[in-house]
């Protein structure tokens, strides 16, 4: 069972975001700072804390979504991502979600596609004038359709 618990615990969010395994896959390697205007959720998988998922409303009804999974929870990443889509579909009125992954972070790119996001394109030298970043998005309707096609019976 996967559950999401809203959190405003900045220390917890930063501890996860600055975990060496999280930083290794981050876009710029600088670590993570808590952002007060972001909605954070603790992820629990079968009762065990597995990381943080979050979104920030970049435009009205557009959520920039990201995940920070601890190593022991990564085997559940697809299930967590799909459950998070179900959660925000049920609890918000978003119209579109976006995300991005550094070109060097192939796992992040694969993950975005695996949970139903569509590749939009790549912006060269997006991070610090060095790293290229690939952007992904999906509308609410596209995610609902994806979830219907990829639900377990």
Where are these regions (language model features)?
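Active-site rim helix/loop that mediates acceptor-substrate recognition in acyltransferases
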Residues: 23-41
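Conserved acetyl-CoA binding element of GNAT-fold acetyltransferases
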Residues: 60-72, 100
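Conserved beta-strand-loop-alpha-helix junction that forms the acyl-donor binding cleft
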Residues: 98-110, 126-127
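Conserved catalytic-core motifs of GNAT/GCN5-like acyltransferases
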Residues: 100, 118-134
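Conserved N-terminal entry element of GNAT/NAT acetyltransferase domains
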Residues: 1-8, 141-153
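Conserved acetyl-CoA-binding loop-helix of GNAT-fold acetyltransferases
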Residues: 74-90, 114
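Conserved beta-hairpin
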Residues: 38-51
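Short amphipathic alpha-helix that is part of the acyltransferase structural core
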Residues: 1-28
């Amino acid at each position: 069972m996967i559950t999401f618990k809203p959190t405003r615990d900045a220390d917890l969010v930063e501890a996860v975001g600055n975990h060496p395994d999280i930083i290794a896959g981050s876009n710029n390697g600088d670590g993570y700072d808590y952002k007060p205007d972001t909605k954070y959720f603790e992820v629990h998988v079968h009762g065990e804390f597995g990381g943080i998922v979050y979104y920030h409303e970049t435009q009205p009804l557009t959520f920039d979504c990201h995940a920070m999974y601890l190593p022991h929870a990564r085997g559940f990443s697809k299930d967590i991502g799909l459950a998070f889509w179900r959660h925000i579909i049920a609890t918000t009125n978003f119209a579109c979600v976006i995300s991005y992954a550094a070109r060097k972070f192939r796992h992040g790119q694969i993950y975005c596609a695996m949970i139903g996001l569509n590749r939009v394109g790549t912006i060269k030298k997006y991070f610090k004038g060095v790293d290229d970043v690939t952007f992904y998005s999906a509308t609410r309707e596209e995610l609902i359709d994806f979830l219907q096609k990829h639900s377990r019976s």
